[in-house]
Amino acid sequence: DEKILLFPSWETGGTHLRSPLARAVWRRHRQFTAAFEDAWLRSGRFEAAFPGELQDVSAGEWRRVVYDSPADYPAVHPQHERRKYLLFQQNAPGPSRLVSFAGFGEYGRSKLRRAQHLTAAGFTPEPEMLAHGFLRRRFVAGSPVGPGEVTAELLETVAAYLAHLYREHAAEPSVSSDTLREMIATNLEEGLGQSWSKDLLDLPSGEWIERGVMLDGRMLAHEWIRSATGYMKVDALDHHDDHFFPGCQDIAWDLAAAAVELNLGNHGRDVLVEHYRSISGDRGIAQRLPFYRIAYLSFRLGYTSLASATLGDSPDARRFVVETRRYIELIERELGSRLVGHRHG
């Protein structure tokens, strides 16, 4: 044991680890950490690369900037957010730049290329430079889209954005349809309780991936900013290449996610799909959407359930509980009376 040393990204006693064995073992080993604040901020290295006054908006702190009240905050898992700062430059009336961690080496360069591509297409804020793994972009003033704030312009923009990803950002799928089916079955059984039975869910067999795409992967409503020049997508660079489902996948995942997170009814969903289909030429999207709607809802059910369990007695844990209930209601509605009757009968 004395020869095992731990180099975690942040110092912790391990009390929040899910595994009892991991919690016990963690305490036996010495830890060595280098705080970002010491190595980069207090040393002056970060300011040398990004001159100006910095405001830390990591771990959900960005919500203080764009919302008037905590009652309006969307749920955030602080540990799943990248480090980011608002940059206030001399004589500017407000923040002029956003500096966020993108990754070192090719990881960062690939994010820069994607940002440049999406900016050229008119969908995301302009990237300016990449230094020390951090990407500096123009800060776009505006308001995050909230519940009930869907407009025709937003649906047109979302459709055009997803059609652009479909046409221009092809990639090998990260997981197969069988793996998605396994995720669906596991998350529904764990999220809806032991009374749930796999034979209630008649998922079609076969492969449902028409074309792999480097997805957006974060089609939450608040990730769309209503600005003076139209709607802009934020947090669009790397969720196809992180630790979460589904990686690179059929664009139907993002389209299903958009319909869920914008709380679209049948008419709104039809409008979004038709806009997307007319721009992309993807004639089979309507056939693939039902499978991916269940897949997305199942993923979010698992994510929000785990997030609420790991965040303890915190405001974000309570927000995730509300989100979990919403996804359960949507799943019940999607699967119909068979599942509802089985759960409550």
Predicted region positions:
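A generic structural motif
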Residues: 2-14, 24-35, 126-135, 244, ...
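Structural alpha-beta junctions
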Residues: 2-5, 19-33, 93-94, 118-126, ...
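Helix-rich C-terminal or lid/interface subdomains of diverse kinases
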Residues: 6-12, 16-19, 23, 27, ...
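Juxta-kinase regulatory segment immediately upstream of eukaryotic protein kinase catalytic domains
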Residues: 25-70, 191-193
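Conserved ATP-binding subdomain of kinase catalytic cores across diverse folds
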Residues: 62-201, 221-223, 228-230, 234-298
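Pre-Walker A segment
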Residues: 201-203, 208
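Catalytic-loop of the protein kinase fold
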Residues: 211-221
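Long, compositionally biased intrinsically disordered regions
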Residues: 339-345
